[in-house]
């Protein structure tokens, strides 16, 4: 018997309320069974690959001053979705599996998407940065407001954790190595 889908309620700045639902491989019907009606609904699953019905699935529903919208996602691996409102750029950034998505937070229109070669570990945003930082298992990259990659850093070990601390991107690898990057340039700082 498959486990029940997971659910999370989140609040984003600007009066946005989000509800995430996600589940394992082939659980799309269970994840979407409790979808609420009203507002627009767009399935971005095909951006993850060809056979999305066998993939893990997720749904994000946003309610806010600009209206209600929902987006569906797919991933070939089980993942917990994450999101951050990049208020200075006016973009709701979400990640699921290998893909990062940039949405208009009021309408839900997809402005851009970026697919990583490895699963995404963390999504970091700050109003002090001109980009969001996406941490995948073996690369760190900065995505600009228009969806272009501002900089990219490859790693020789799998990154298991990432955070913005003291004005630095601090990465912990599978072997326990800690690396610090300048969040504006991606250059290593010691």
Language model features by range: what are they?
Residues 66-76, 109-115, 147-154, 190:
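A short beta-strand motif characteristic of beta-propeller blades
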Residues 6-9, 15-38, 43-50, 70-89, ...:
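Repeated scaffold domains used in trafficking and secretory/extracellular systems
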Residues 101, 141-142, 179:
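WD40 beta-propeller blade core
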Residues 171-190:
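Blade-level signature of beta-propeller repeat domains, shared across WD40, Kelch, NHL, RCC1
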Residues 105-107, 144-148, 183-185:
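Short loop/turn segments that connect beta-strands within beta-propeller blades
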Residues 85-114:
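Extracellular-facing segments of soluble proteins and assemblies that are Gly/Ser/Thr-biased and enriched
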Residues 56, 88-89, 96-98, 128, ...:
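Short loop/turn segments that connect beta-strands within the blades of beta-propeller domains
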Residues 2-4, 12, 58-78, 105-107:
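A short helix->beta-strand "capping" segment at the edge of beta-propeller domains
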């Amino acid at each position: 018997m498959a486990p029940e889908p997971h659910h999370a309620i989140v609040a984003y700045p600007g009066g946005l309320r989000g509800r995430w639902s996600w589940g394992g491989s082939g659980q799309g019907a269970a994840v979407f069974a409790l979808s609420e009606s009203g507002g627009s609904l767009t399935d971005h699953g095909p951006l993850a690959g060809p056979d999305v019905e066998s993939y893990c699935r997720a749904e994000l529903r946003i309610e806010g001053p600009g209206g209600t919208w929902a987006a569906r996602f797919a991933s070939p691996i089980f993942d917990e979705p994450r999101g951050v409102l990049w208020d200075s750029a006016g973009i709701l950034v979400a990640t699921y599996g290998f893909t990062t998505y940039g949405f208009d937070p009021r309408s839900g229109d997809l402005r851009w998407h970026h697919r990583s070669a490895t699963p995404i570990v963390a999504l970091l945003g700050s109003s002090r940065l001109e980009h969001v930082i996406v941490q995948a298992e073996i690369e760190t990259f900065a995505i600009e407001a228009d969806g272009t990659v501002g900089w990219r850093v490859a790693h020789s070990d799998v990154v298991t954790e990432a955070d913005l601390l003291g004005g630095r991107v601090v990465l912990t690898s599978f072997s326990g190595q800690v690396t610090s990057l300048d969040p504006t340039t991606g250059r290593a700082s010691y």
